[in-house]
Amino acid sequence: MHKSEDQLLCALGRLAELLQRIGHPRALEVADHLVGFRQAPGQMLRRLNGNDWWAGAGSLAAETMADNPGLPEALWCREIREFRELMIEIGEALQAEGAANPGISSWLLAFNNWNASEV
């Protein structure tokens, strides 16, 4: 397994935990991807590079802009920041593996800018 795949597995695990903590509807899907990655890494890399992760309003990346579901504001801000940081880690690992989804670069730029601005 490549270093980027190890990083990807670690980030996926942490993302699954975070999504579970905040009650996100895609938490189980991300956890399933983690299990699937161990069984069929090539297939999971293709899925993680897919539009449902990186393109448009329904993508997981876009979920980082979701409204607070009722958590204390300071907690929500920390969780969303971590969500973006994990998506950055996943996006960078995918790029290191040769991922070509055009949405990844745009989201990485946005996430880094938002985190730097403390948005």
Briefly describe each language-model feature range.
Residues 64-119:
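Amphipathic alpha-helical binding modules
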Residues 14, 24, 57-59, 92, ...:
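Intrinsically disordered, low-complexity regions
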Residues 41-80:
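Short, charged early-sequence alpha-helical segments and their helix-coil boundaries
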Residues 1-4, 8, 26, 44-46, ...:
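Residue-level recognition of alpha-helical structural elements
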Residues 19, 52-54, 87, 94:
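Compositionally biased, low-complexity repeat tracts
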Residues 1-38, 105-119:
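Short terminal alpha-helical segments
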